[in-house]
Amino acid sequence: LLSFDPDKNGGVASAVLDNNGYPGVKLTRTVKLDRNKFIDRFEAQSEEEHTYDYVLALSDKPELGDGFVDARLEGKSPAYEFIKGVKSKIYKNGIVTFKAGTTKFEIKNTYKTPIEVFWAEAPDIMYGSSEKDTHTIKSYMLVVRTKGKNLSISSVIILGKKR
């Protein structure tokens, strides 16, 4: 953790992981909360080519529009094997905007190169305070994938009111 600066409307936190998460990759993340707006800036730097996935777990189905095709989401993590019914679409301009429930999302590859967006229904999210009080809710995975030596993703998430 580099910094944590809370304020009356939220605050800003910043962290760096240099070579410890993935050999040869420096990861930097800065998140800011300003009332109902959440801004996430995620960067990766390397001397080698990588496949980078920016992953969101959503409790509401994303409203992404047309043009998605059946796909297979492959990755190094065994968690990818649990995600079924995957759809994908390439966004040549590197920007995807959508809603999920009452929340609005704008995710940009700030290098303005294409991104591939995958989404699928994922295993349900379980929550509760005890074994007898456990509930599940539907869960959706959204993965923004890009390839290259470096990654720079900027997300703006505007939280809507609960229904």
Which functions belong to the PLM regions below?
Residues L1-R163:
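CBM-like, beta-strand-rich accessory domains located in the C-terminal region of large
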